[in-house]
Amino acid sequence: MKKRISVSVAAVATLSATVLSAPSSTAQDTPKDPADTWPSSNVRTTAPGSVAANKITPAMKREISRVVDTGRRAATRVTPSSSARALAGAQIRCATFESQRYCLRYGWTKRTAADLQRDLVQREARAKVAGHKSGDASILDSLRTHARMAPRAQVRADRAELRQAARATAKVLDLRHDIDGTPYPKGFFARHSEVERPAASASKRRYPKRYYVMNWRHTRQQNRSYWCGPTTMQLIAWGWHGGKKPKTQKTWARRLGTTTSGTSIGQMVRGVNKYTGYDKKRFAGRYIVLDISGYKYGKWLRLHKRHYSKYRAPIVTHPVLKARYFDYMQGWSGSGHFQVGRGYNNRGKNPATIGLFEPYNPRRFNSSAPYVARLQYHRAYQGFLANKAHPQQNIGV
């Protein structure tokens, strides 16, 4: 009798585990957009790729040394237990490469270091008071992690981050020239002969009405509540390398340095550049973290269209995962989050949508929560609001 009871308990446990992760009978992980096919039906001639990584000039080297030296002195004034304001003041420092500003621990921005130090601390403090728990790492988490490093290790990390940023300067200028109309600095092409000069007669680029990248069958749900970063990276790498099975989320969590606090967007971008070929010139070039705080909806949507159809590559989206922005969450909310942006549809009179691989399935962690499918075609304007609602207001492109 005891043996039969133990078998029954085991069977119930197995059934319960299955129910937690199984979809409802009506959920379908299949494309709702007929244009989302694989092999892709996209016209390849509309995808010219990005720009080559530029060389690090002597002026860039001097700027890197200036910012690193400032950090070397500041590192002795803070510890992991220092206040958020003190950590931000010591660690969020900015370099200027060819008139473009890059800030350590954040990304490419038009805001000053002082603005970022104030805005990020205030916005994340409000999010914390509201009881939000992130699946991504907050700026404060990143600052504390950096402060735990030995001083020499901090200097090496800062220098490596700035060198990677400096080599992406040409891409930033190319992107901002297309999106914002930012002019190239005087003498830029003379200093960077490796970068192709755009045609003087080139008109503003028009993008296809719809465009998708990546095999829609290559999806997975995240296995832990704070693994949206590793799962997003898993799917992006699977999209690049192909194969029947992707590397495990545990592998990606280790490679990205994910903790129970989550993964930073800087770690995500470095992962795409290191472990896939989407950073090649014929695709997206070196991925960057871009500040979208000053973007309105039209410019944000153009950024997405440009990336998918020109680069044929995914985007690391960075929204706050709230039901008010994502109706497919059916009232269930998360917080800071990563997804795979993989296309758009702006055809006809219907509102534009963004194609997503959504890693988060609430049913995986709570049997009473709704099932959320991996394939989503989400209203673009709501995605824009979710990105702007995130305390960091940035994206990986």
Task: Say what each PLM segment does.
Residues 1-29:
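Secretory targeting and sorting signals
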Residues 14, 235-236, 271:
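Residue-level detector of alpha-helical secondary structure
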Residues 143-213:
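Long amphipathic alpha-helical scaffold segments
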Residues 46, 50, 210-259:
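Active-site nucleophile-adjacent alpha helix/oxyanion-hole segment immediately C-terminal to the catalytic cysteine
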